């Protein structure tokens, strides 16, 4: 008689859960998806996307808040279409992202265009589309945008991205609000930059913007940044400059391991208190969440190829790799790893979960206790954000397929690449 296996609770519960000993995405077996569609495979839950967006709606209540999904986290068209249908705007950082928004019927009047390196052609495309505003990140960019807009006979709506020099206490690669980061205009220089903007042709000032980082799980960094922005609004008002909105960026963290995620309602209640007390309660608030909307709405499913014991380490070699999910390699990020169909009564071994790419840094997880055999499927959790969007073809590996589950049904929302497709883009000298 086998001992019943104790099943963990996935971080994406209830949208990812075990049923009859097998991990499911909503009503669909993850093992079935892997059998039918192959691995590596990204699996998204439509219900999880809606639940994450609803958490923001509850926190917003009747206030004037525009949620602009930070689509760099996951720009699959099916994901974008869901947020567009829910009424979201979009935070973009390239013309390509704008074209994705337009392709799914997103409202360009709800699009904010961020990014430090906007090209003139991108500015023209955004002006023609009628985006809500440009989050301008430097004075040279401001001058270029003025020239482009003036030449087109248009007025570019701008919000200057201010760098408040606030430490978000997160990984340095995803910290964006310190003075040594490349993003934004130093807050001490912002009043002069706004005066410059006010004098330029083709420019209409509409907002103030900041974004201090990502995977933040405390309110204090957000509120510190907000206080500095409100002080800036006071200075701008003294210069006769008024703004329509205050853009607080994104950055709310999610649970990867044992973190306590910051609920949107908890942050927003504090934000509303602050802006009301300072007399800016009538201003629209813009938010740019990305990870908190999609991170725990996705899994990366992979197949075990080999179990390789060595004197120093036991390696569990899978068919997914750093080219599929680079976060562990790039940030030493933690992702939970689950057996899709845990083996009852079998002793677990401790493994580093590694891929087939020819790099020592190709790993997905380290020192994980798993009871598995060759051919079993594993699910890498919290893979809905910064997963497929950061994938590459390193080692001439075609990128994974993506599937979205909706109740008891699933839809392939990105076909698996083929080597033939990769080779078709290249040519030789004859």
Locate each region found by the language model:
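Hydrophobic "anchor" residues on beta-strands that sit immediately upstream
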Residues: 68, 133, 157, 245, ...
